[in-house]
């Protein structure tokens, strides 16, 4: 009889949750297990979920300080817990998933689900172990700690201490790392480790709401000898804005749309530029690729930037002039700054975290 699948719960409110869920699911499959990834919010009320997802993106991109007020309010007051009743369809979908798949292990990458799980009948709750995968770094939102779990997985030791300060016993916290895509751990060629000389490869990942993004892209494209790739994501309007801003420089850059090949793409780069989202921050650390941060969403992303500070590689470059200057400084003296940057990232990198987490989940599932 095949063991039951590991049920992984995620939500589309930030790339970090989905990236962690996909990374763990792929690693479980590589280790011979099975996993089911589900988003009860999206599956139970897709239209309403898409509305709130778009509202979330609008707030973090255009009104980040308003988002921060909501984020902090949910940290200090039980607003989410007191409004769970409004999400009953998601709770019922979650219960249906558990009753259908009968998992022995549930791993969640979005904290609200642990509060739903606490509402399950005890005889159903006792049939599985709950593993909470914290996608925050350094500063941890209270929601990760305000409902029980059997284990908490965190990206690093400083985050473990922050979670412990919220009341979780240290023996229940495992700093395994952030479960990025297992392809980051493959022993394949890593062209981005080769010194760039004066001709670096630079990837700029544009946020749809980032003011000044196309202008930053034009600043990069104007640098002679640089191989520049501009990632515009799913929104074709972003690509059009970039092309208009580039004008005659358009032929000097590669435009990259939505892709699932980030491990191999990051492996080729000498520098990556983008906002301090949870997924991108962790992926650049895993790939040991120097990361220039254009934007830090207050509250939600401050911990990611704090993590880069902890490693000693934080660089805030909100415009083209700053980004070009930081890259040129790193390239000076035969790439001295770039080499130091890479060495610090290599010390912090845990590209196999998803595989070690998969092994833990499968051991609990046996």
Language-model segments: residues:
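Conserved donor-nucleotide binding/catalytic region of nucleotide-linked donor-dependent transferases
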Residues: 315, 320-321, 327-346
